[in-house]
């Protein structure tokens, strides 16, 4: 199975978590497309991206959560790449049946993503537009998401994850990636 990670991180060189997780992906022979490196101007070549997708069996969209959404380059990539005839519409052949999952890093604590938490919404609710698009509109084989939660105390001010937390998260991410091609279930949500 040929697997591809679409990395949408605006500053991967200074990332601790996403950079560490890419090492796990490399160990499992995942190809990586770094959108910020490929498209520094932000202008996505949709035809090129569709060709790359066709060469892979599964996609993982990996990104840090920014303002409870994805970085702008990922939205642009989706809008430019997932077009009529490829991702949706009659005779679309690009996405139907292809495995798709998300890998999200969030600086905020897991407990804050709950109806009784600071932000009142679960990660499932925040990521629902991705599931709606990929599972129900593009008819991809939705495999769920992996989420790494941080330890933010004051919003936007002080957050960090210990080396132990990052390594534990990396091991869980590796397991998530190994299970990506499994035939049953919707992907394990960590």
Question: Predicted segment positions?
Answer:
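N-terminal beta1-alpha1 ligand-phosphate binding loop
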Residues: 1-33, 164-168, 172-175
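Hydrophobic/aromatic beta-strand patches that form the interior of the parallel beta-sheet core
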Residues: 4-6, 33, 60, 101-103, ...
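Short histidine/acidic/glycine/proline-rich micro-motifs that form metal-
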Residues: 10-12, 38-40, 117-120, 151-153
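Generic recognition of short, well-ordered alpha-helical segments
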Residues: 16-20, 44, 72-76
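Glycine-rich phosphate/pyrophosphate-binding loop and the adjoining helix
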Residues: 22-23, 131-190
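N-terminal beta-loop-helix "entrance" segment that forms/cooperates
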Residues: 30-54
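Active-site loop/turn elements of alpha/beta-hydrolase fold enzymes
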Residues: 35-37, 65, 147
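Helix-loop-strand module that forms the ligand-binding subsite of alpha/beta enzymes
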Residues: 47-131
């Amino acid at each position: 199975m040929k697997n591809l990670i679409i990395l949408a991180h605006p500053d991967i060189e200074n990332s601790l978590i996403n950079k560490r997780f890419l090492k796990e992906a490399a160990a499992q022979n995942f190809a990586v497309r770094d959108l910020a490196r490929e498209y520094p101007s932000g202008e996505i070549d949709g035809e090129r991206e569709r060709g790359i997708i066709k060469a892979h069996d599964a996609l993982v969209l990996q990104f840090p959560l920014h303002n409870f959404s994805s970085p702008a380059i990922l939205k642009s990539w989706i809008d430019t790449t997932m077009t009529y005839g490829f991702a949706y519409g009659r005779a679309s052949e690009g996405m139907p049946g292809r495995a798709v999952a998300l890998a999200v890093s969030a600086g905020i604590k897991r407990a804050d993503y709950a109806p009784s938490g600071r932000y009142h919404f679960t990660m499932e609710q925040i990521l629902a537009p991705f599931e709606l698009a990929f599972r129900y509109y593009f008819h991809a084989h939705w495999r769920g998401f992996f989420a790494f939660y941080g330890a933010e105390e004051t919003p936007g001010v002080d957050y960090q994850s210990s080396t132990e937390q990052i390594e534990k998260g990396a091991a869980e991410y590796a397991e998530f990636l190994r299970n990506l091609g499994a035939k049953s279930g919707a992907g394990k949500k960590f």
